[in-house]
Structures are given as structure tokens and as C-alpha cells.
Regions:
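Cofactor-binding loop segments of dinucleotide-utilizing enzymes, especially the Rossmann-like FAD-
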Residues: 1, 36-38, 134
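Amphipathic alpha-helical segments in well-structured domains
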Residues: 11-15, 48, 149-150
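Glycine-rich dinucleotide-binding loop and its adjacent helix/turn
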Residues: 1-25
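A Rossmann-like FAD-binding core segment of flavoenzymes
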Residues: 19-115
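A conserved FAD-binding loop/helix module that cradles the flavin
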Residues: 135-177, 181-183, 192
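C-terminal auxiliary extensions adjacent to catalytic cores
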Residues: 191-238
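FAD-site-proximal beta/loop scaffold in flavoenzymes
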Residues: 84-150, 162
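FAD-binding beta-loop-beta segment adjacent to the flavin cofactor pocket
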Residues: 112-130, 183-204
Length: 238
């Protein structure tokens, strides 16, 4: 779907891994990525280079392809200028904050997202209600990633403790994001960024020169990706 949506590189990673499987086991099959966006929205150069060099005959990317309707019976996706029938459709619909947020009247931006005070992640319309992760209207250049949501939670928890104990809320929080994506079963890439609260603009802004993307896909990044995944799962779920 058109950005913003959850896990910006997710659809491209998924397509890459399906193409990797097809190349090994079903060489007559093909992946067609129909993207509502004008271009790849995350790790563009790394993904497009992988597709060109690894899956030139296996994966086709079509930008500006906004889905309007799905016929599940015929496995057909209807787009503005064409209908596409496939053996398997993997549809990712437009996204918004969940029904609990909608029912509570917390969605205030574009009928999709919840606006918050970024120092506390408190709702702009419901005092003492704190919202984080994919549900919020993100700050500039802030991805809707699980790693970022984990950082949101830490800032929010720290703020809630301060508010409950009568202490001052941290007025200069810093968030970090790291995301790895596999482009084959043994090759991966990453993107990283740092976001600092700007008191004047009352939002988080990306720190220039902090973070970046992989120089190239490689097996070392694939090993790092697995370690990164285990660490974020442990930090979030245990």
C-alpha cells in the first residue's frame, strides 16, 4: 500500500525470499511486486540491485500500481490500468491504527493514525492514555518498525513513571532504529537511524549523519540479522 505502512521494507523482503525460493525450486514461477508507491520506499538501492543481479528473470517490480479491488474466487487483483491474475495473491491493504483506537476516538490524523505528545506518547485528545508503535502519526522520517515501537515503549514507560512520581519528564529523549532484511536465504542488508527530540518543533527529527544503510548485501549481515532478531525478541517478549 501507499506509505506509511507497517515495516516499510517488509513487502520487499518477502518478495525477495519468495523469488529466492522460486529460483531454486520453481524456476518457471515468477514474483510480480505491484507497489502503490512511486518507488521502493525503504533500502531502495539495495533491494533493486539485488533484484537485478539475483532475480532478473524471477521478480518484476511495478511501481504506481494501486490496488482497488480483489476477487478472491479468481485470485485477481484489480488495479487502475490492469487486472492481474496470479496463482497466489499476497495482498497488503492500506493500514491505520487498530479498532480499539478508532472506537476510543483516538484517531485524529487522516482518519488513520493517533497523534501523541512525543515526550510522553500521551494521546493529544485523551489525557493519561499513552499510545505507541504503528498506531501513532509518526515523526518525520520515523519508520513504523517493531524496533522503533520498542524504543517508543521505553520512552513512554520512563515518562509514565516520572508522571506518577511527580518527577520531571525527560525533555531530550533519543530513539534509534535498526532493521535487517534478507534478500536471499544467506544474504542480508540493513538500515539504521537515530532520532532526537526537537524542543522547538515538538517532534523527533532524524540526526544527520547518524545511521545509514549497508554498503552491499552479504553473508555477514545475514549473521548479524539473526543476532539482531534474537536480541529484539528477548528484549520485547521476555
Amino acid at each position: 500500500p501507499k506509505a506509511p505502512y507497517r515495516c516499510p521494507p517488509g513487502p520487499y523482503e518477502r518478495a525477495s525470499l519468495v523469488a529466492s525460493y522460486f529460483k531454486r525450486s520453481k524456476p518457471k514461477s515468477k514474483v510480480i511486486v505491484l507497489d502503490a508507491n512511486a518507488e521502493v520506499v525503504s533500502k531502495k538501492g539495495l533491494f533493486t540491485k539485488a533484484w537485478e543481479e539475483l532475480y532478473k528473470d524471477t521478480l518484476e517490480y511495478r511501481p504506481n500500481s494501486e490496488l482497488t479491488e480483489v476477487n478472491a474466487a479468481t485470485r485477481t487483483g484489480k488495479f487502475q490500468f490492469e487486472d492481474v491474475q496470479a496463482g497466489v495473491l499476497n495482498v497488503i491493504p492500506p493500514q491505520r491504527a487498530g479498532s480499539i483506537a478508532a472506537n476510543a476516538g483516538l484517531i485524529t490524523a487522516n482518519k488513520r493514525w493517533c497523534e501523541v505528545d512525543f515526550l510522553t506518547f500521551e494521546s493529544r485528545v485523551a489525557p493519561n492514555v499513552h499510545i505507541l508503535g504503528d498506531a501513532i502519526l509518526a515523526a518525520p522520517a520515523m519508520p513504523k518498525s517493531a524496533f522503533m515501537a520498542n524504543n517508543h515503549a521505553k520512552v513512554a514507560a520512563d515518562a509514565v513513571i516520572a508522571l506518577l512520581t511527580g518527577k520531571s519528564v525527560n525533555d531530550h529523549p533519543i530513539l534509534a532504529n535498526t532493521c535487517y532484511s534478507y534478500v536471499s536465504d544467506r544474504l542480508a542488508i540493513h538500515v539504521a537511524s537515530v532520532h532526537k527530540f526537537d524542543a522547538e518543533k515538538k517532534t523527533f527529527l532524524a540526526v544527520p549523519g547518524a545511521g545509514g544503510v549497508s554498503a552491499a548485501r552479504n553473508e555477514v549481515e545475514a549473521d548479524y540479522a539473526w543476532g539482531w532478531a534474537k536480541n529484539i525478541w528477548a528484549d520485547t517478549l521476555r
